A protein has these predicted regions:
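Chitinase-like catalytic core of GlcNAc-active glycosidases
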Residues: 1-26
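Active-site-proximal helices and loops of the catalytic beta/alpha 8
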Residues: 19-30, 36-128
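Secreted, luminal/periplasmic, and some membrane-associated catalytic domains
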Residues: 130-132
Length: 133
């Protein structure tokens, strides 16, 4: 279970598309998170996005995990995927990590070379909710 799937195989693509539509019918979903999108066919992801939009209407949110520290690669990926797709801001995470390990770090640079600064509408950042006391 949960083994790697060959998304380049037409039958696998059809099954995953059918499954995503079934899931959307069964659960009150309006968004999908795709893991490790750089390992998927972009055409297949666009087909899933289009299929869900066409069958269930607009308003879906699609986000992908593209773990790379290259802002340029991420921006090019977003350009190819279109405006309906967002990515987690991996460069921002790297910046926070780097700043946390640097004595006297300048927090004003945390947004440099990040999706949040470059294409904020397509950037997703994780928020950790405050703990209740």
């Amino acid at each position: 279970m949960f083994a790697d799937l060959d998304y380049s195989h037409p039958e696998v693509e059809k099954d995953v598309l059918d499954w995503s539509k079934w899931l959307a019918r069964e659960l009150p979903l309006k968004g999908v998170r795709f893991d490790a999108v750089k390992h998927f066919s972009e055409d297949f992801l666009r087909e899933v996005i289009t299929g869900l939009d066409e069958e269930f209407g607009p308003g879906w949110f699609f986000v992908g995990e593209f773990w790379k520290d290259s802002l340029d690669d991420m921006c090019k990926y977003l350009e190819r995927m279109g405006k309906k797709f967002s990515l987690f801001d991996a460069p921002l995470v790297y910046n926070f990590s780097k700043l946390s390990k640097t004595e006297g770090a300048d927090l004003r640079t945390v947004f440099d070379d990040t999706l949040v600064k470059t294409v904020p509408v397509n950037a997703v950042v994780c928020r950790i909710p405050p703990t209740s006391s």
